[in-house]
Amino acid sequence: MLTFAEEIMLLMLDDDGLFLPIRGGSVEHVLAGAVLMDLAFANRIDTDPEQLVILDRTPTGNPMLDRVLARIAESDETKDTKSWLETLAGQGTTEIRRQALTSLIERGILESQDERFLWVFRSRRYPTIDGRVEREVKLRIEDALLSDDTPDPRDIALICLVDACDFLRDIFSEREIERATPRIEQLRKMDLIGREVGRVIAKIEESVMMAMALTPH
């Protein structure tokens, strides 16, 4: 089973293995939320509107998750989910990205290709080797949004993350998005971490828009 961060990284790549443009400032919070979700599903943390607490300090065996688990366990301060999202995102999520991509490469799902011109490094692509995994992730999202069946809790959590960074528009047509909007709004309320990710990103975008409006032209 892939982690949420690995699934998000797959969805962030286009057909050429390049990263899609996403909403400004959202990727750090989405990846931070992805790790918190995996820790919650692994019964290492519990969340409620008031606080995020450690249930079990035992390492999961996944370095990406265990690094964040240790960070939370070492904290002397009690924080809620929103505060931890902002803390983890503020510290940067480069290591989360690196570990997620490394795992996908080691599993044979992606490969890493460096593009060079006259021996000068220009960019790195991550083309898909095994497209079945990405198709399965997208199919789960499609089934959860476009059917009347009760979604799996992991699929609800994933949809909340994908919705927060506006990736649904890269998966569905405008007509499908319009049809699924009531369902999306319903699922947003069913996962606390995903809901907080969406709120934090919306707040960031609101601040950016206000700053732009106040900037002299």
Where are the predicted features?
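Short, amphipathic alpha-helical interface elements at domain boundaries
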Residues: 1-92, 199, 205-217
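Short, structured motif recognition centered on aromatic/hydrophobic residues
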Residues: 36-39, 100-104, 157-166
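Short, Lys/Arg-rich nucleic-acid/phosphate-binding segment
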Residues: 49-52, 114-119
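Short, amphipathic alpha-helical interaction segments positioned at domain boundaries
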Residues: 56-98, 106, 119-158, 168
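Hydrophobic, aromatic-enriched interface-forming segments
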Residues: 105-114
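Glycine-rich, aromatic-bearing surface loops/beta-hairpins
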Residues: 125-217
